[in-house]
Protein backbone atom coordinates (compact mmCIF):
# COMPACT_ATOMS: atom_id res chain seq x y z
CA UNK A 1 0.00 0.00 0.00
CA UNK A 2 1.31 3.44 -0.94
CA UNK A 3 2.35 5.66 1.95
CA UNK A 4 2.44 9.35 1.00
CA UNK A 5 5.15 10.07 3.58
CA UNK A 6 7.51 7.78 1.67
CA UNK A 7 7.65 10.43 -1.04
CA UNK A 8 7.88 13.61 1.02
CA UNK A 9 9.74 12.71 4.21
CA UNK A 10 13.46 12.70 3.55
CA UNK A 11 14.10 10.13 6.27
CA UNK A 12 11.77 7.74 4.41
CA UNK A 13 12.52 8.70 0.81
CA UNK A 14 16.33 8.59 0.84
CA UNK A 15 16.67 5.07 2.35
CA UNK A 16 14.03 3.72 -0.03
CA UNK A 17 15.78 5.19 -3.08
CA UNK A 18 19.09 3.77 -1.84
CA UNK A 19 17.62 0.29 -1.41
CA UNK A 20 15.98 0.36 -4.84
CA UNK A 21 19.13 1.60 -6.56
CA UNK A 22 21.40 -0.90 -4.85
CA UNK A 23 19.02 -3.80 -5.41
CA UNK A 24 18.86 -3.11 -9.15
CA UNK A 25 22.62 -2.50 -9.40
CA UNK A 26 23.40 -5.74 -7.57
CA UNK A 27 20.92 -7.84 -9.50
CA UNK A 28 22.03 -6.60 -12.94
CA UNK A 29 25.64 -7.33 -12.09
CA UNK A 30 24.69 -10.70 -10.59
CA UNK A 31 22.90 -11.80 -13.75
CA UNK A 32 25.81 -10.75 -15.97
CA UNK A 33 28.25 -12.56 -13.66
CA UNK A 34 26.26 -15.81 -13.75
CA UNK A 35 26.07 -15.81 -17.55
CA UNK A 36 29.73 -14.90 -18.00
CA UNK A 37 30.93 -17.54 -15.52
CA UNK A 38 29.33 -20.35 -17.52
CA UNK A 39 30.47 -18.86 -20.84
CA UNK A 40 34.06 -18.68 -19.61
CA UNK A 41 33.97 -22.36 -18.67
CA UNK A 42 33.42 -23.23 -22.35
CA UNK A 43 35.33 -20.44 -24.08
CA UNK A 44 38.88 -19.39 -24.86
CA UNK A 45 40.04 -15.76 -25.11
CA UNK A 46 41.26 -14.85 -28.59
CA UNK A 47 42.14 -11.88 -30.78
CA UNK A 48 40.93 -11.01 -34.26
CA UNK A 49 41.78 -7.82 -36.12
CA UNK A 50 43.36 -6.49 -32.95
CA UNK A 51 40.16 -6.89 -30.92
CA UNK A 52 39.61 -9.26 -27.98
CA UNK A 53 36.90 -11.90 -28.28
CA UNK A 54 35.73 -15.10 -26.71
CA UNK A 55 35.85 -17.92 -29.25
CA UNK A 56 32.14 -18.64 -28.68
CA UNK A 57 31.07 -15.03 -29.33
CA UNK A 58 28.62 -14.72 -32.21
CA UNK A 59 30.43 -11.56 -33.33
CA UNK A 60 33.70 -13.50 -33.53
CA UNK A 61 32.14 -16.32 -35.55
CA UNK A 62 30.38 -13.86 -37.87
CA UNK A 63 33.67 -12.07 -38.53
CA UNK A 64 35.45 -15.35 -39.24
CA UNK A 65 32.68 -16.37 -41.65
CA UNK A 66 33.12 -13.08 -43.47
CA UNK A 67 36.88 -13.60 -43.77
CA UNK A 68 36.45 -17.16 -45.04
CA UNK A 69 33.88 -16.01 -47.58
CA UNK A 70 36.24 -13.29 -48.80
CA UNK A 71 39.10 -15.75 -49.13
CA UNK A 72 41.32 -14.12 -46.51
CA UNK A 73 44.12 -16.10 -44.92
CA UNK A 74 45.87 -15.97 -41.55
CA UNK A 75 48.71 -17.56 -39.62
CA UNK A 76 46.15 -20.12 -38.48
CA UNK A 77 43.76 -20.60 -41.42
CA UNK A 78 40.44 -18.87 -40.78
CA UNK A 79 38.57 -22.01 -41.83
CA UNK A 80 40.19 -23.93 -38.98
CA UNK A 81 39.51 -21.15 -36.47
CA UNK A 82 35.90 -20.96 -37.65
CA UNK A 83 35.39 -24.72 -37.31
CA UNK A 84 36.87 -24.69 -33.79
CA UNK A 85 34.71 -21.72 -32.78
CA UNK A 86 31.52 -23.27 -34.14
CA UNK A 87 32.29 -26.50 -32.32
CA UNK A 88 32.94 -24.72 -29.01
CA UNK A 89 29.78 -22.63 -29.33
CA UNK A 90 27.70 -25.71 -30.16
CA UNK A 91 28.93 -27.49 -27.02
CA UNK A 92 28.14 -24.42 -24.89
CA UNK A 93 24.65 -24.12 -26.33
CA UNK A 94 23.93 -27.84 -25.96
CA UNK A 95 25.13 -28.16 -22.37
CA UNK A 96 24.07 -24.78 -20.99
CA UNK A 97 21.14 -23.51 -23.04
CA UNK A 98 19.30 -26.20 -24.99
CA UNK A 99 17.73 -27.71 -21.87
CA UNK A 100 15.83 -24.48 -21.23
CA UNK A 101 12.77 -23.41 -23.19
CA UNK A 102 13.07 -20.20 -25.14
CA UNK A 103 11.69 -17.15 -23.41
CA UNK A 104 12.59 -14.28 -21.17
CA UNK A 105 15.95 -14.73 -19.48
CA UNK A 106 16.71 -18.03 -21.24
CA UNK A 107 20.49 -17.62 -21.10
CA UNK A 108 20.35 -16.63 -17.43
CA UNK A 109 18.02 -19.49 -16.50
CA UNK A 110 20.13 -21.96 -18.44
CA UNK A 111 23.28 -20.71 -16.73
CA UNK A 112 21.68 -21.07 -13.30
CA UNK A 113 20.64 -24.63 -14.10
CA UNK A 114 24.18 -25.40 -15.26
CA UNK A 115 25.60 -24.06 -11.98
CA UNK A 116 23.11 -26.20 -10.07
CA UNK A 117 24.03 -29.30 -12.07
CA UNK A 118 27.69 -28.69 -11.23
CA UNK A 119 26.93 -28.26 -7.50
CA UNK A 120 27.89 -24.59 -7.41
CA UNK A 121 24.42 -23.61 -6.18
CA UNK A 122 21.56 -25.65 -4.76
CA UNK A 123 18.10 -26.15 -6.24
CA UNK A 124 16.68 -23.99 -3.44
CA UNK A 125 19.13 -21.21 -4.30
CA UNK A 126 18.23 -21.49 -7.97
CA UNK A 127 14.55 -21.06 -7.13
CA UNK A 128 15.37 -18.22 -4.75
CA UNK A 129 17.34 -16.35 -7.40
CA UNK A 130 14.50 -16.64 -9.90
CA UNK A 131 12.13 -15.24 -7.26
CA UNK A 132 14.58 -12.37 -6.73
CA UNK A 133 14.49 -11.82 -10.49
CA UNK A 134 10.72 -11.39 -10.27
CA UNK A 135 11.24 -8.81 -7.53
CA UNK A 136 13.81 -7.01 -9.68
CA UNK A 137 11.24 -6.81 -12.49
CA UNK A 138 8.74 -5.24 -10.10
CA UNK A 139 11.26 -2.60 -9.09
CA UNK A 140 12.34 -1.78 -12.63
CA UNK A 141 8.85 -1.58 -14.10
CA UNK A 142 6.98 -0.15 -11.10
CA UNK A 143 9.71 1.81 -9.34
CA UNK A 144 7.54 4.83 -8.52
CA UNK A 145 4.91 2.69 -6.81
CA UNK A 146 7.48 0.51 -5.03
CA UNK A 147 9.22 3.52 -3.51
CA UNK A 148 5.82 4.67 -2.30
CA UNK A 149 5.20 1.29 -0.67
CA UNK A 150 8.63 1.15 0.94
CA UNK A 151 10.85 -1.86 1.46
CA UNK A 152 10.72 -4.76 3.89
CA UNK A 153 13.16 -6.99 5.73
CA UNK A 154 12.58 -9.52 2.96
CA UNK A 155 14.19 -7.14 0.46
CA UNK A 156 17.20 -6.85 2.74
CA UNK A 157 17.36 -10.65 2.88
CA UNK A 158 17.25 -10.81 -0.92
CA UNK A 159 20.22 -8.46 -1.11
CA UNK A 160 22.16 -10.53 1.42
CA UNK A 161 21.37 -13.73 -0.48
CA UNK A 162 22.60 -12.27 -3.76
CA UNK A 163 25.86 -11.09 -2.18
CA UNK A 164 26.42 -14.49 -0.59
CA UNK A 165 25.71 -16.56 -3.70
CA UNK A 166 27.71 -14.20 -5.90
CA UNK A 167 30.79 -14.56 -3.68
CA UNK A 168 30.50 -18.34 -3.76
CA UNK A 169 30.15 -18.46 -7.56
CA UNK A 170 33.15 -16.16 -7.94
CA UNK A 171 35.18 -18.37 -5.58
CA UNK A 172 34.24 -21.43 -7.64
CA UNK A 173 35.19 -19.62 -10.85
CA UNK A 174 38.52 -18.63 -9.33
CA UNK A 175 39.30 -22.25 -8.46
CA UNK A 176 37.99 -23.90 -11.63
CA UNK A 177 38.96 -21.34 -14.28
CA UNK A 178 41.17 -18.48 -13.12
CA UNK A 179 43.79 -20.40 -11.13
CA UNK A 180 44.78 -22.66 -14.01
CA UNK A 181 44.35 -20.02 -16.71
CA UNK A 182 46.47 -17.41 -14.93
CA UNK A 183 48.70 -19.87 -13.04
CA UNK A 184 47.74 -18.41 -9.66
CA UNK A 185 48.85 -19.96 -6.38
CA UNK A 186 47.22 -19.06 -3.08
CA UNK A 187 49.34 -18.33 0.00
CA UNK A 188 49.76 -21.27 2.36
CA UNK A 189 46.77 -21.68 4.65
CA UNK A 190 44.42 -19.60 2.47
CA UNK A 191 40.96 -21.04 1.89
CA UNK A 192 39.99 -20.79 -1.81
CA UNK A 193 36.31 -20.81 -0.83
CA UNK A 194 36.85 -17.45 0.89
CA UNK A 195 38.21 -15.77 -2.23
CA UNK A 196 36.39 -12.57 -3.19
CA UNK A 197 36.48 -11.15 -6.69
CA UNK A 198 37.09 -7.48 -7.32
CA UNK A 199 33.39 -7.03 -8.04
CA UNK A 200 32.52 -8.65 -4.70
CA UNK A 201 34.73 -6.18 -2.85
CA UNK A 202 33.36 -3.16 -4.71
CA UNK A 203 29.72 -4.13 -4.21
CA UNK A 204 30.34 -4.83 -0.53
CA UNK A 205 32.05 -1.45 -0.21
CA UNK A 206 29.10 0.30 -1.88
CA UNK A 207 26.76 -1.47 0.53
CA UNK A 208 28.77 -0.32 3.54
CA UNK A 209 28.94 3.25 2.24
CA UNK A 210 25.21 3.45 1.51
CA UNK A 211 23.82 1.60 4.53
CA UNK A 212 26.51 1.43 7.22
CA UNK A 213 27.72 5.02 7.28
CA UNK A 214 31.27 4.11 6.29
CA UNK A 215 31.64 6.64 3.49
CA UNK A 216 34.29 8.70 5.28
CA UNK A 217 36.28 5.58 6.12
CA UNK A 218 36.44 4.53 2.48
CA UNK A 219 37.20 8.08 1.36
CA UNK A 220 40.18 8.28 3.71
CA UNK A 221 41.46 4.89 2.56
CA UNK A 222 41.15 5.93 -1.08
CA UNK A 223 42.91 9.25 -0.45
CA UNK A 224 45.80 7.42 1.22
CA UNK A 225 46.06 4.98 -1.66
CA UNK A 226 46.11 7.78 -4.24
CA UNK A 227 49.03 9.43 -2.45
CA UNK A 228 51.28 6.41 -3.04
What do the predicted segments below correspond to?
Residues 1-134, 138-228:
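Amphipathic alpha-helical interface elements
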Amino acid sequence: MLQIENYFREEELVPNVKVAAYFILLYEHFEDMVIETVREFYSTPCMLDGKPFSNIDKEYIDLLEKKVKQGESGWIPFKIRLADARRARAVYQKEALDKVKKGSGRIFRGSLNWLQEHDVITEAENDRILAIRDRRNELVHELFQEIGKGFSDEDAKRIADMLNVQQRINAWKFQQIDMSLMEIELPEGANPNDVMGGDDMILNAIFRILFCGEGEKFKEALDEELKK
